[in-house]
Amino acid sequence: ITTIVTLSIGSYVAWQGLRTWKTQLKGTQNYDLAKSTLINLNKYVESIYQVRNPAIWGGEYPKSTDVEKFNIHQDEKQYKEKCYVYQNRYDKIYNIKPYLQENVIEIEVLWGEKLKNKFKQLFALEFKLFIEIIMYTESFKHKNDEYKDASSYDEKIINATIKNDSFRDEINKIRTEIENDIQPYLKL
């Protein structure tokens, strides 16, 4: 009887230990995912803001030889320069986005669909910006009615410093919602 009681107590203690370990492991997993997601989310959003920065510094333009400067029409040169600048700026988004998408897949598996849908909204806004940039750069190449004047895209693309920036406000709203939903998982 003593052996049975001892084995029963030992089994109970072992079971409680495994349960505690499992809870700690899940808490650590949630914490690591939440931390990684918030870091990648902030890098992603900051990269979007950098794309929208109205200042284009001299170092961002492509290096060209003097011969190229004389052989290219001004509109074509301006088009190529803008494409180069925005492609380089967008590369930062392309570099961080796969990590964020990986986080979103993990979030969907562990925490459900709610956050995934918010990330979809954020990715849709970034895609909208991408299309606007294409239209903006094309406006330098095509000086006809098909494309608007480049200045008409300014408020959508480079409005990053104006107080009434609806695009930035929408991104910040989604970012805040995501951060608020992730916050509870940052507790160990």
Model-identified regions with their sequence ranges:
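Short amphipathic alpha-helical/adjacent loop interface patches that line ligand
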Residues: 18, 41, 175
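Membrane-embedded alpha-helical transmembrane segments of multi-pass integral membrane proteins
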Residues: 6-9, 42, 127
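Transmembrane helix-loop junctions and nearby membrane-interface residues
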Residues: 11-18, 47-54, 132-136
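Interfacial loop at the N-terminal end of multi-pass membrane proteins
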Residues: 55-68, 76-81
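Membrane-embedded hydrophobic alpha-helical segments
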Residues: 1-24
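Amphipathic, membrane-active segments
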Residues: 22-63
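An amphipathic alpha-helical interaction surface
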Residues: 68-74, 84-188
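Terminal, low-complexity, charged helical segments
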Residues: 5, 50, 113-114
